[in-house]
Amino acid sequence: MLTLTPAERLWLQAYQSHLKTEFPGCVEEISIFGSKARGDARPDSDLDVLVVIREGDWHFKEALTRPGYDLAIGTDVVPSLHVYTSAEWAQLRAHASVFREVVERDRVPVS
């Protein structure tokens, strides 16, 4: 049960739009996970966002995440962006990552 505030919904729309415009074809998936996805968020909860991309190094990931944080400036939105390549995300599955298991259980795809 996805529980986003109006400000979080606006932020998410703006971030998705930015990624589609600036990085066309690079993003494979955007999902919300954690308390916002489970429906048990508190007023001070952050917005956990998983972004899976086709490929890219840490410089590219930084270029993807920085605008997300910039878009939150002056709002009540506190994004926590987690960017993985599809290969890295698959590797977490192969190694039975607890983080991946939690994300898989809770996540709500939004793109």
Language-model features, listed with the residues they occupy:
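Short beta-strand->loop micro-motif that forms the acidic, two-metal-ion catalytic signature
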Residues: 48-51
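Catalytic core of pol beta-like nucleotidyltransferases
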Residues: 1-28, 38-43, 53-111
